[in-house]
């Protein structure tokens, strides 16, 4: 199951946990209030997992691929890591399922504070359209993840500031309703 906590403001290596000196954990309920959903599946069975098939059908995730992020397998590795770690949003939900390895998604809370979400093998996360976020590997420097999409994939990031983007405006309205 994913773990989450408020981050420190250190400029130290982004792959470190960055917990506050006084650790402040974030519950799954707190993540849910931000529109972030997570669950755990059996990553060893992803190719034949009926639960994953059900999730894909119920959510109309018709397109998927697998991405491996490691210096030996990803072209332009360092450049890609910088792009993934740039704060941005998407027009559609971002769904990721960790098949191997681990990494961090960072999301902003209602007060614009960073929350770090640790994901490892078996964890699936859905980040809502319009949420500011970023991704980085952890100190293991490796992740293999399934990316799921409704329809054709769109990876266009809108770097912050993108507050006038319709997806962001809808997300801010969602936050106001859950406050």
UniProtKB/Swiss-Prot annotation:
Q: Which UniProt keywords apply?
A: Amino-acid biosynthesis, Cell membrane, Cytoplasm, Dioxygenase, Iron, Membrane, Metal-binding, Methionine biosynthesis, Nickel, Nucleus, Oxidoreductase
Identify the taxonomic lineage of the organism of origin: Eukaryota, Metazoa, Chordata, Craniata, Vertebrata
Q: Looking at the keywords, is Metal-binding present?
A: yes
Summarize where Ni(2+) binds, as residue positions: 88, 90, 94, 133
Entry's InterPro entries? Answer: ARD (IPR004313), ARD_euk (IPR027496), RmlC-like_jellyroll (IPR014710), RmlC_Cupin_sf (IPR011051)
Organism whose genome encodes this protein = Xenopus laevis (African clawed frog)
| Role | Catalyzes 2 different reactions between oxygen and the acireductone 1,2-dihydroxy-3-keto-5-methylthiopentene (DHK-MTPene) depending upon the metal bound in the active site. Fe-containing acireductone dioxygenase (Fe-ARD) produces formate and 2-keto-4-methylthiobutyrate (KMTB), the alpha-ketoacid precursor of methionine in the methionine recycle pathway. Ni-containing acireductone dioxygenase (Ni-ARD) produces methylthiopropionate, carbon monoxide and formate, and does not lie on the methionine recycle pathway.
Ranges that cross the membrane: none
Q: What is this protein called?
A: Acireductone dioxygenase
Per the record's keyword annotation, is Signal included, yes or no?
A: no
């Amino acid at each position: 199951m994913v773990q989450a906590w408020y981050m420190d403001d250190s400029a130290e290596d982004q792959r470190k946990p960055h917990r506050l000196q006084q650790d402040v954990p974030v519950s799954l309920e707190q993540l849910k209030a931000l529109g972030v959903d997570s669950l755990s599946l059996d990553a060893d069975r992803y190719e034949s997992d009926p639960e994953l098939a059900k999730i894909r059908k119920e959510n109309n995730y018709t397109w998927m691929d697998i991405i491996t992020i490691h210096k030996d397998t990803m072209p332009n590795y360092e450049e890609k890591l910088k792009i993934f770690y740039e704060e941005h949003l998407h027009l559609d939900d971002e769904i990721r399922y960790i098949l191997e390895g681990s990494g961090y998604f960072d999301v902003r809370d209602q007060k614009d504070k960073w929350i770090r979400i640790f994901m490892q093998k078996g964890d699936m996360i859905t980040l809502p359209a319009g949420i500011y976020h970023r991704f980085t590997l952890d100190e293991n420097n490796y992740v293999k993840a399934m990316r799921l999409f409704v329809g054709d994939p769109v990876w266009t990031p809108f770097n912050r500031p993108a507050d006038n983007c319709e997806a962001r405006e809808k997300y801010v309205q969602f936050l106001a309703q859950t406050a």
